[in-house]
């Protein structure tokens, strides 16, 4: 087999630079494999992952294998111009003499589904993931009280202090986005159906209207889906901007996360210490930090937009976890 590969390469790859038998892995899921070779054209700065097969026919499993090789190879090369999720590939079938040249692409959300399915089938776990997330809600967290008698209030935590009752009232979630910091894998990006009416103020801030929430998943459905997606995660970091004061509290109140399974990191505390010594933050909200660093605005207060902005800020500051 290897003699056939070497002969093929010698006869057909005179100009290209060939790297063969490249070991690839994705350590956070313990995925590993070996690419037969990568053909490179230094002049054009292009490269193609090539697989050698000796089979009767090329089917979907070989395309899937290449997609996984591509992900594992380029996730360790974050500065590469090549994408984790789409690329051109080549399969050489020595049995038939046919060379297949094709492109494969997958969304970051579907790529996570593929990896999660592999984890379930193979008994693997995602370890040490850094998930950036954001919530859009129907309002702020409110504190009410004191009350002489224990009140009954929806979406609230009641506590007793100094012979009085107090209530912490939580808003409803109307959008949730979760993305892996290193690879951009999308774990969730969904609108959430609310039971209460969206105020005009919230509609103006977020751009989310009541019509957009019609037919969307309920919070209970989101909880089931998120539980299924994260059940194979261990030692996971959940990163949110101002998370300790807002997002983390809401996630825990609605029991969307298991506090024994995750560790919360508030980037409001992380970002300032990574600024250059001669540069201080004018303001600490996400939009202000983004504008200070990039001199442009982004469409804030949509969950995935906020997540992407936060990731861009942290990568610009070379923050690692």
From Swiss-Prot:
It holds the Pfam family RNase_T. GO terms for molecular function: 3'-5' exonuclease activity; nucleic acid binding. The keyword DNA repair does not apply. It is an enzyme of class 3 (hydrolase). Gene3D superfamilies: 3.90.320.10, Ribonuclease H-like superfamily/Ribonuclease H. Its EC number is 3.1.-.-. Keywords: Exonuclease, Hydrolase, Nuclease. SUPFAM superfamilies: Ribonuclease H-like. Residues 130-314 form the Exonuclease domain. The keyword Hydrolase applies. InterPro entries: Exonuclease_RNaseT/DNA_pol3, PDDEXK-like_dom_sf, RNaseH-like_sf, RNaseH_sf. This is Uncharacterized exonuclease R569. It comes from Acanthamoeba polyphaga mimivirus (APMV). The lineage of its organism: Viruses, Varidnaviria, Bamfordvirae, Nucleocytoviricota, Megaviricetes.
